[in-house]
Amino acid sequence: MVVVVILGGSTFVLLNSEGEGDTGQPQNYSILSAYHGLDQLPFAASLLCGFNVAGDDGMPVVFSVQLQDESVVPESFLVIRSDGETVVPNCATLHPADEHLEQRTVLLTGDFGTYGETPHRVEVTGPLLTLNGEPLLGLSTEDITPLEDGPRIVLAERFAPDTNGLAGECPNGTAQVIQLTWEGGVTGPGNAALGEEQRLGTLMLLEDGATVNPLALVDDDPDNHVLACLAEDSPAQLVEVHAGLFHDPGDDANPATQVVVIDG
């Protein structure tokens, strides 16, 4: 059974199969964010799609669950602009956020309303599947971050340092790793590598009440995931990042942002 619930402009799909292996618990999936990050994608973005998308708008869409790569196709998405025009994206891809613990951010490209009009709604209209094969048809959101705004953190997951996909990422002495998922790709100002300013502006509230900075920020590639390596054993409960430190590809800086840490 599929139940669609609309709350605060976003649509959630509750899935409860009555077949073999049913757990009896509904599974709740959602679109965490849709981020109108760029109005003129550079030619280099074409490498992500396999064909020329230079000049397209770019909009990363982050899901609450990991996705099957084979199900991520343009025809599974629809963008509705503020002028009412509907746009099927030119490209839909999990690149560049395609590492083992990522695979939840779909980059959409197309004409999403740069000149006077804006993207109003994103819908899943085709057979998009979770990593476990659950359908996400019907998910949607109208909570779209506008072009002029900077990125926020939408998900923080806690992992052991030896988790598959994290080997060798963090320095010696790391006790836990917090994977931070941003709305869009982040670097330092002017596409600079992340450094001390970003590390010291990232605060972790631990279960024992202490507030600490990460030992290091790693996975410094051009996607929307950053790994915060913590030396402390007490589990991280909340992450807070000061404003103006993490910039998107358009060089828009983040607002102050915080999110509760969950088990990955």
Q: Which ranges hold each PLM region?
A:
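Non-catalytic beta-sheet/beta-sandwich ligand-binding modules that flank or precede catalytic cores
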Residues: 15-264
